[in-house]
């Protein structure tokens, strides 16, 4: 496999510039942008610390690797749905149009090459590769200070298991069918938990096998008691790991476990929902309110992906302005004028856009740059406490505990609006109401598309000219589709298939 062979070979290719030209797929072996060596031998806890830095940097990406949390994962998770957050047909420059238009037919159209990436593939496997090296070194017992630095070494290994789980989880949601569709029986992605030989050609594991490993990694990391108990921006703590685990269980349809983990976080983490008065300022990159962030990336300085291709610059009105809220979403949110989340959007200012959007607030303003610099977006959310409350509400409802569902839903709603009618009661709470609240809260955070797939929703951009809103003319299939449509899951990049014939392509895609 083109990517995996390069990641997991055993020191077969050094990262030194002098040797890069001799390496197959040597882009995978470049040092993190802070200069730490991502693939040098790990002989001490100090080496492990440098490798840890490289692992987190792979999660964030840089100007040349934008296929994960640096950019494309958020685009995929929101704009592929396109019912709440759409490509900006007027002011955009096609950086977020690929999955919105859905004009692709062949696997060759899917690429993870540098800044033109339209798929999340390279960077997640880089994260996995670097996590595997940390785990192997930490558990191998050969580090020079293994005894005196045991607590630090154990923590880094636990963090690596969490990030390995997260990367596999994100990959399988993109390239595999939803777990809830066939209980994971269909093909997922290559599952890699250790060093492979340079000529290895791993096949795709099933979705269920991938999820089993994801849960195993997360539960082992949590039960190790090695993860930090206090949340630190940029690094995963035990509460961040539990929040990810709750999200995983939710995507599996394991509502009992998802609820149990969510309630543990709500009751014991010490995290607190932002109040209505805090909400807008909480996203301020200069002075963020950390009380809701269970795991966020800390993007800092010119070494991280805060440049033109970062997700913040794609979303912002003064940036590339690639995405806008759909008319349906704007109508849904503004139906409650007291909802503070209305303040998270800005109106268009360019004349051509104003002609279409009018005074409606369409530009999401969550990821605003520090000091007004759009390239200095320091807050990149992975998971927040508000999502945990919404998970708890949904799972309680699905377990027929409406009282508890109302409690968790209203805990969130009363911190977003002063409108009493927006609060749920045992008599009027529905699953749809909970899912709508989830859409309002998490827009732009890369979860809408996956929620629609796991719930077997029909994703409807529009069905006629009457409800077309601000959408451009799309193919009939792109106007409205569900998870049975073959384009609902991405094609594995053709370059990977060419390098590894053991990888079977997703149905419907030619070369």
Predicted regions and their residues:
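Extended ligand-binding clefts on enzyme/binding-domain cores
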Residues: 45, 50-52, 60-69, 209, ...
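Conserved, well-structured interaction surfaces
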Residues: 94-175, 223-227, 375-380, 395-399, ...
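Membrane-proximal, proline-rich intrinsically disordered regions
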Residues: 3, 23-80, 281-283, 311, ...
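Sec-dependent bacterial lipoprotein signal peptides
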Residues: 1-21
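Short, surface-exposed recognition loops and adjoining beta-strand edges that mediate ligand/DNA contacts
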Residues: 36-42, 66-88, 171, 176-185, ...
């Amino acid at each position: 496999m083109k990517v995996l062979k390069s990641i997991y070979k055993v020191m077969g290719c050094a990262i030194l510039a002098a040797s890069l030209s001799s390496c197959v797929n040597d882009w995978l072996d470049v040092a993190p942008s802070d200069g730490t060596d991502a693939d040098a031998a790990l002989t001490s806890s100090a080496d492990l610390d440098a490798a840890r830095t490289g692992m987190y940097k792979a999660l964030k990406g840089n100007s040349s690797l934008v296929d994960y949390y640096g950019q494309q994962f958020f685009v995929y998770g929101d704009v592929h749905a396109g019912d709440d957050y759409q490509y900006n047909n007027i002011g955009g420059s096609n950086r977020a149009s690929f999955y919105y238009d859905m004009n692709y037919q062949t696997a060759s159209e899917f690429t993870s090459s540098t800044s033109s990436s339209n798929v999340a593939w390279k960077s997640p496997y880089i994260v996995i590769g670097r996590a595997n090296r940390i785990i192997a070194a930490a558990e191998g017992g050969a580090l020079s200070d293994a005894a005196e630095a045991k607590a630090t070494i154990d923590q880094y290994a636990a963090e690596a298991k969490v990030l390995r789980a997260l990367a596999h989880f994100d990959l399988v949601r993109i390239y595999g069918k939803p777990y809830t569709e066939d209980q994971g029986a269909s093909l997922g992605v290559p599952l890699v938990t250790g060093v492979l030989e340079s000529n290895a050609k791993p096949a795709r594991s099933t979705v269920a096998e991938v999820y089993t490993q994801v849960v195993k990694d997360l539960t082992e990391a949590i039960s190790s008691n090695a993860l930090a108990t206090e949340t630190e921006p940029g690094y995963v703590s035990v509460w961040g790991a539990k929040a990810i685990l709750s999200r995983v269980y939710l995507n599996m349809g394991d509502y009992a476990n998802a609820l149990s983990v969510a309630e543990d976080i709500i009751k014991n983490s010490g995290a607190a929902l932002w109040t209505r008065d805090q909400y807008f300022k909480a996203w301020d990159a200069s002075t963020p309110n950390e009380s809701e962030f269970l795991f966020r990336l800390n993007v800092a300085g010119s070494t991280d992906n805060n440049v033109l291709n970062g997700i913040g610059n794609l979303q912002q009105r003064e940036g590339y302005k690639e995405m806008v809220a759909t008319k349906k979403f704007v109508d849904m949110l503004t139906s409650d004028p007291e909802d503070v989340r209305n303040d998270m959007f800005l109106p268009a200012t360019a004349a051509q856009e104003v002609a279409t959007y009018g005074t409606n607030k369409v530009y999401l303003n969550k990821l605003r740059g520090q000091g007004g610099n759009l390239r200095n977006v320091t807050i990149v959310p992975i998971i927040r406490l508000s999502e945990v409350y919404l998970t708890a509400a949904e799972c309680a409802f699905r377990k027929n505990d409406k009282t508890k569902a109302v409690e968790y839903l209203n805990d969130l709603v009363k911190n977003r609006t002063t409108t009493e009618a927006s609060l749920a009661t045992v008599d009027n709470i529905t699953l749809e109401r909970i899912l709508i609240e989830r859409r309002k809260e998490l827009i732009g955070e890369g979860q809408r598309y996956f929620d629609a797939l796991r719930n077997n929703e029909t994703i409807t951009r529009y069905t006629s000219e009457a409800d077309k809103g601000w959408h451009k003319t799309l193919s009939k299939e792109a106007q409205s589709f569900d998870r049975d449509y073959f384009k609902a899951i991405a094609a594995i990049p053709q370059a990977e298939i060419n390098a590894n014939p053991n990888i079977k392509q997703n149905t419907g895609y030619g070369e």
